């Protein structure tokens, strides 16, 4: 069986989407004759923890090496699951973080993970290094390991690094440094995975040395095992259910939908009474306040965060 070293800060028991993608990749690697060893974060304070994902990783017999560091999340470990701050506060903290840390505030953990990974590679033979980004700092150290040990490297882009539409570069130096770091990391990479074609095209445009053959596109999918023995739910009502799964941040906001729903409720209450809006994930306090401010009918809204095994 071939051996793959997976470097991923985000891994169970942390929750949310980025965690699940890496977990599902590693869960099924053994089916294709690959044995994964995952280097990930130790105890952290995070917006969501999902013990069902942790049990899934244990059931799959994934070897996990947990690495503590001094990144902001690790320093908040004693608080466990922490509340997501209000959006304007999150933006301020994000701007400060992006000014201080290049390429991101996980750089402390990535440096520690590099040391741990180097020791592992000295003790065991691995056939591949796999890294999923963000955080981008772990791509930097994965490329360094590839160059030192001459082991093929695959990077999985869940989000763009340089050119990300949520990216913030406080100074020209920050912008230059981010692009330079990504350029060097990509130069060391043997294969690139992206979640969509648009991301692939942007990378090809930004870095002309890349070719179409360097890429594979693997969209976000689902795990069939999550739906084994799931019984269909027969809803008694015939309401139209509109569901949003995920979180809102930056310019991704529900306020336009909520305001439009309010206007529709004035003009055609008969229509809005037959609609339910479901928000699955973190729904910020300011958005809940907007629902209250607009005096929308409470029965039209469902706010919930579920672990992935909730039926």
Pin down the residues of each PLM region.
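A short, active-site helix/loop in glycosyltransferases that binds the activated sugar's phosphate group
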Residues: 163, 183-214
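Nucleotide-activated donor-binding/catalytic signature segment of Leloir-type glycosyltransferases, i.e.
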Residues: 274, 279-281, 286-311
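Conserved donor-binding/catalytic core segment of Leloir-type glycosyltransferases
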Residues: 234-252, 258-261
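Carbohydrate-associated surface elements
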Residues: 198, 218-221
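A conserved catalytic-core segment of Leloir-type glycosyltransferases
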Residues: 41-111, 120
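Membrane-proximal helix-turn-helix segments that form the acceptor-binding/catalytic region
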Residues: 137-140, 144-148, 173-194
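Acidic anion/phosphate-binding donor-loop and adjacent secondary structure
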Residues: 72-78, 213-214, 221-238
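N-terminal subdomain of nucleotide-sugar transferases
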Residues: 1-72, 191, 200, 264
């Amino acid at each position: 069986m071939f051996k793959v070293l997976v470097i991923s800060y985000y891994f169970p028991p942390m929750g949310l989407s980025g965690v699940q993608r890496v977990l599902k990749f590693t869960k099924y690697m053994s089916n294709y004759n690959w044995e994964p060893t995952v280097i990930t974060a130790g105890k952290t304070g995070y917006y969501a923890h999902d013990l069902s994902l942790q049990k899934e990783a244990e059931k799959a017999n994934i070897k996990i090496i947990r690495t503590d560091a001094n990144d902001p999340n690790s320093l908040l470990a004693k608080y466990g699951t922490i509340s997501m701050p209000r959006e304007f506060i999150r933006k301020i903290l994000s701007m400060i973080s992006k000014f201080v840390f290049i390429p991101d505030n996980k750089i402390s953990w990535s440096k520690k993970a590099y040391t741990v990974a180097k020791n592992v590679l000295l003790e065991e033979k691995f056939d591949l290094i796999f890294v999923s980004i963000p955080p981008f700092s772990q791509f930097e150290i994965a490329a360094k390991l590839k160059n030192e040990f001459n082991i093929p490297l695959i990077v999985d882009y869940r989000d763009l690094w340089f050119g990300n539409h949520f990216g913030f570069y406080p100074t020209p130096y920050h912008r230059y440094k981010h692009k330079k770091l990504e350029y060097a990391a990509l130069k060391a990479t043997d294969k690139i995975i992206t979640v969509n074609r648009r991301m692939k095209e942007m990378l090809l445009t930004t870095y002309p040395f890349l070719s179409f053959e360097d890429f594979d596109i693997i969209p976000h999918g689902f795990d069939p095992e999550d739906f084994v023995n799931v019984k269909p739910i027969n809803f008694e009502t015939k309401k139209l259910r509109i569901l949003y799964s995920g979180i809102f941040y930056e310019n991704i906001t529900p306020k336009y939908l909520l305001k439009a729903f309010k206007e529709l409720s004035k003009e055609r209450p008969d229509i809005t009474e037959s609609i339910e809006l479901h928000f699955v994930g973190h729904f910020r306090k300011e958005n809940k306040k907007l629902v209250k401010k607009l005096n929308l009918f409470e029965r039209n809204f469902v706010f919930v965060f579920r672990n992935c095994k909730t039926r």
